[in-house]
């Protein structure tokens, strides 16, 4: 009889533990985040790489992470609706790579309508760092970054590394960014697509820095596509750095309909749009007013002659 009672008690304890570890509204695959504690619990759940598959997260309030024990979300595979809210007070200064509010977004992940404010300065290898996400293989849409980011390689204001399947759409960054290799206002390295995004933050403008390579207003290094993007943040310091560009530092993919209005400085391979183009590149400009006028006049003369 005692064994039966012990067994029943054990089952009761296990049942209670299970209910404690389940996320809010798990039955409907929707998680609501309204407090810093909610967000911290969500991050801990994402330690299991399959937990977030198919879930939708709704952020319903602005959050200030200052003084909290929040650690970056390890991996996310679902949909995160920021709903226009801001997560501020994000700070990270420990050793590591793939650092950001989210460390990794998989190909199925979507993060939209979210602003991140903070200071990100990982130590050690300090690669693939961005205020929103360290490495992105999913979709980041209508997001913004404010604050500062510093590191070594693949350092971006919003995203550290934008992978082959990664897409960054209609995003902005006003973050000050400092790095050594592949440093950009939106993303450090772009292997996917960056579209209709803009940067206003300064990139590597301090004198006391290691000699940087491949630095751009939108991306430091891009082997993917960059379309419809603008930069108005100063890039580089005089006589310091190689492959310094207003949109991209080192480009071997496609740039289309982009513009830069900021000063670009460096030692070698410095350009208003791209610092250096590698072979097999594509650069497409939109039609200029003068070209349109020339085409119209040519057509008119042809008609008059006939």
Feature names for model-found ranges:
Residues 1-11:
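Bacterial N-terminal signal peptides that target proteins for export
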Residues 2-4, 18, 44:
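A generic local structural motif
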Residues 10-19:
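Bacterial N-terminal signal peptides
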Residues 25-306:
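Surface-exposed repetitive/solenoidal architectures
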């Amino acid at each position: 009889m005692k064994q039966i009672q012990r067994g029943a008690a054990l089952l009761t304890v296990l049942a209670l533990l299970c209910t404690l570890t389940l996320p809010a509204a798990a039955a409907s695959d929707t998680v609501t985040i309204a407090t810093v504690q909610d967000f911290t619990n969500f991050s801990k759940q994402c330690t299991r790489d399959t937990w977030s598959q198919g879930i939708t997260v709704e952020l319903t309030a602005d959050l200030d992470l200052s003084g909290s024990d929040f650690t970056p979300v390890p991996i996310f595979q679902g949909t995160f609706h920021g709903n226009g809210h801001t997560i501020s007070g994000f700070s990270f200064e420990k050793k590591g790579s793939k650092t950001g509010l989210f460390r990794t977004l998989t190909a199925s992940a979507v993060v939209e309508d979210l602003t991140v404010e903070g200071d990100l300065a990982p130590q050690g290898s300090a690669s693939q760092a961005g205020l929103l996400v360290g490495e992105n293989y999913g979709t980041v849409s209508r997001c913004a970054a404010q604050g500062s980011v510093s590191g070594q390689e693949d350092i971006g204001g919003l995203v550290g590394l934008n992978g082959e399947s990664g897409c960054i759409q209609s995003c902005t960054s006003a973050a000050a960014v400092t790095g050594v290799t592949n440093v950009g206002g939106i993303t450090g390295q772009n292997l996917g697509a960056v579209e209709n995004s803009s940067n206003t933050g300064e990139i590597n403008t301090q004198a006391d820095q290691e000699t940087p390579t491949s630095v751009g207003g939108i991306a430091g290094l891009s082997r993917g596509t960059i379309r419809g993007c603008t930069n108005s943040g100063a890039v580089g310091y005089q006589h310091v750095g190689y492959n310094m560009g207003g949109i991209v530092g080192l480009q071997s993919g496609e740039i289309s309909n982009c513009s830069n209005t900021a000063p670009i400085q460096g030692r070698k391979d410095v350009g208003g749009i791209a610092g250096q183009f590698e072979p097999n590149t594509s650069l497409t400009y939109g039609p200029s007013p003068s070209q349109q006028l020339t085409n119209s006049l040519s057509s008119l003369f042809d008609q008059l002659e006939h």
